[in-house]
């Protein structure tokens, strides 16, 4: 099975991902972002990149997919910079897998 890769965020931050062949969706409101993530999850997206700012608006939606194999939801910084929550999520995952923070 081939999975698709999607990107969700504000237009300025995510439009460049089209160059890599990713499916880019713009969203700025909770409703738009939640609906986009749910649609991507239903439509066989293996990875969804989402800007930290958008993820901050829908933490319950992000949390709902954490326990599932797909989609993997990866937080990325926006064009405005990072909030640090994406790196924190990676550190938590590594610590959970390895038993300590090696980053």
UniProtKB/Swiss-Prot annotation:
One of its GO terms (biological process) is sodium ion transport. Keywords: Ion transport, Sodium, Sodium transport, Transport. One of its GO terms (molecular function) is ATP binding. Pfam families: ATP-synt_F (PF01990). Coiled coil: none annotated. InterPro entries: ATPase_V1-cplx_f_g_su (IPR008218), ATPase_V1-cplx_fsu_bac/arc (IPR022944), ATPase_V1_fsu_sf (IPR036906). This is V-type sodium ATPase subunit G. It comes from Enterococcus hirae (strain ATCC 9790 / DSM 20160 / JCM 8729 / LMG 6399 / NBRC 3181 / NCIMB 6459 / NCDO 1258 / NCTC 12367 / WDCM 00089 / R). The gene is ntpG.
